[in-house]
């Protein structure tokens, strides 16, 4: 909607995009080998890093952060472009020092990396990140709970987006209304569909981490429920 990734979307902003509701947070997650010397995001410079495959969410976020940091791919000893399904094995095979992932937690791929070899979750928090979050409403600071993954006992600060269910102005209001009604009339069942959904609250799902205006069909339901004026 905002048109902030010209490489992925050369046609510019997609102003027909509409949010329906947000789901779970997807923190930008950096996992590093314990023997790599990487403790914070700044330590990635000069290391072997999987930046994600072109077009992926983690690659898009990584490129945004790199631009703000003033980094290029040449600042890494290796900038691999592995898919998210390939990077955990590469980390534990010592082919890379760190990997990035924009994902909800707990996540199976990260559990694989942290149980198959000695790996840690890395803090992503510096003045550049603070400004990035302050300047963009669709980003927010996030915390990955300590103890969720082997090797990381304390909470880890990072930032990220919220996974959002979206539609467009081309989808009629009644269709979106019926989808929203099905989800929220059965919210307890919906929350059991994935561990990352467990803490979802309708009051937050309709206002937090929405990167586009709400669809008219969603607004109709929320007003009927008294959740919006």
What are these regions (language model features)?
Residues 1-45, 50-53, 64:
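Short, glycine-/small- and polar/acidic-enriched structural segments
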Residues 8, 58-77, 95, 111-115, ...:
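Ligand-binding cleft/hinge of the Venus flytrap
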Residues 17, 41, 59-63, 88, ...:
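Extracytoplasmic/secreted envelope proteins and their assembly/folding machinery
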Residues 25, 33-36, 54, 104-105, ...:
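Solvent-exposed coil/turn segments that connect beta secondary-structure elements
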Residues 35, 53-60, 82-85, 100, ...:
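Soluble non-cytosolic domains of exported or imported proteins
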Residues 54-64, 137-207:
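Ligand-binding clefts/hinges and TM-proximal coupling segments of bilobed small-molecule sensing domains
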Residues 73-166, 170-171:
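Pocket-lining segment of extracytoplasmic ligand-binding domains
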Residues 86, 93-94, 103-121, 131-134, ...:
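An extracytoplasmic/periplasmic, membrane-proximal ligand-sensing/linker region
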């Amino acid at each position: 909607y905002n048109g902030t990734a010209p490489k992925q979307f050369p046609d510019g902003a997609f102003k027909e995009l509409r949010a329906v509701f947000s789901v779970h947070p997807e923190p930008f997650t950096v996992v590093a080998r314990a023997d790599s010397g990487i403790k914070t995001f700044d330590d990635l410079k000069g290391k072997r890093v999987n930046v994600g495959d072109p077009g992926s969410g983690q690659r898009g976020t990584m490129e945004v952060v790199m631009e703000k940091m003033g980094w290029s791919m040449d600042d890494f000893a290796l900038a691999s472009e592995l898919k998210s399904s390939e990077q955990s094995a590469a980390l534990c095979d010592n082919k890379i020092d760190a990997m990035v992932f924009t994902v909800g937690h707990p996540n199976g791929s990260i559990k694989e990396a942290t149980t198959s070899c000695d790996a840690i979750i890395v803090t992503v928090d510096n003045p550049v990140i603070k400004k990035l979050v302050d300047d963009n409403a669709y980003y927010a600071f996030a915390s990955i709970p300590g103890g969720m993954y082997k090797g990381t006992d304390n909470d880890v600060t990072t930032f990220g987006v919220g996974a959002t269910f979206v539609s467009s102005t081309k989808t009629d209001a009644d269709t979106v209304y019926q989808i929203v009604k099905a989800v929220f009339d059965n919210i307890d069942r919906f929350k059991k569909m994935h561990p990352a959904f467990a803490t979802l609250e309708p009051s937050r799902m309709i206002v937090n981490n929405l990167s586009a205006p709400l669809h008219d069909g969603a607004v109709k339901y929320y007003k009927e429920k008294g959740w919006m004026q």
